[in-house]
Amino acid sequence: MYQLKIEGQAPGTCGSGKSLLVSALANGIGFPYECASGGCGVCKFELLEGNVQSMWPDAPGLSSRDREKGNRHLACQCVALSDLRIKVAVQDKYVPTIPISRMEAEVVEVRALTHDLLSVRLRTDGPANFLPGQFCLVEAEQLPGVVRAYSMANLKNPEGIWEFYIKRVPTGRFSPWLFENRKEGARLFLTGPMGTSFFRPGTGRKSLCIGGGAGLSYAAAIARASMRETDKPVKLFYGSRTPRDAVRWIDIDIDEDKLEVVQAVTEDTDSLWQGPTGFIHQVVDAALLETLPEYEIYLAGPPPMVDATVRMLLGKGVPRDQIHFDAFF
């Protein structure tokens, strides 16, 4: 264990082998972060004293200018090699609501939702305790150093069930391995829960859930929580590339009687497709127009989709604090 000193904060500790981000959050420190995967750069810090090892030296969250300075690092992608003194602007909103822990989990069910999207259910010994819309870092012993962030699609439960909708990324390392080794009884490790874009039940507004690709997991969790905890109408918009990528809602066990679902594709390659065609932010805009500020809005998906949707929402007058999002890098 190494000591972690952040200017203006009480000292904490860095666990051996844990990322600096996970260690800081486990100490109750409001360390800023977003994707926890090396892509967004929100967890960047300045190293004042000590040594760290980068788990992903080429992570896109660091700019070339950051690398030239030599003392800028991503907390989600480095581990401590000594006592550390760092500089970062901590914020209370990042202090974990639920304590973060590392858990061993068993794969209990794997189902194909589409040709490249799996529903994977894991079970831990203790209860599955998390907020709707949060995510976990997932690891496999067979892939040392490979850590991926996936949102839970289900809700907290005493049975210890954690469900994820995982999309195959052909150029990735974790998802292709999982698709090829998708067998019940396999062991994985979860670290979490993490994420600050969770469901807010007390706003009094209707919920609008928007997902693209693997963002379905996040959008489904928010929709499930909203239907359970409020009596307000819930809308879910989901965008795919082609009709082949579209999901059947019966396969993900979501109650369409209480939920208005709109599924769109960007490439209409099937003459039988009857849904809207276009980018999902355009479909949402056309469907809801000037009523968008009436909603509490939750969205997740690839960064270009999230960026385009946020710009559209702000342009429609939606207050920034009514928009909650996760971008999957």
UniProtKB/Swiss-Prot annotation:
Q: Which residues bind [2Fe-2S] cluster?
A: 35, 40, 43, 76
Entry note: cofactor: Binds 1 [2Fe-2S] cluster per subunit.
Please tell me whether the keyword Metal-binding is annotated for this protein.
yes
EC numbers listed for it are 1.18.1.2, 1.18.1.3
**Could you tell me which residue ranges the FAD-binding FR-type domain spans?**
100-200
Q: Which SUPFAM superfamilies match?
A: 2Fe-2S ferredoxin-like (SSF54292), Ferredoxin reductase-like, C-terminal NADP-linked domain (SSF52343), Riboflavin synthase domain-like (SSF63380)
Q: What does the UniProt record say this protein does?
A: Part of the multicomponent carbazole 1,9a-dioxygenase (CARDO), that converts carbazole (CAR) into 2-aminobiphenyl-2,3-diol. It can use both NAD and NADP as electron donors, but NAD is supposed to be the physiological electron donor.
Name of the protein in its database record: Ferredoxin--NAD(P)(+) reductase CarAd
Query: What species is given as this protein's source?
Result: Metapseudomonas resinovorans (Pseudomonas resinovorans)
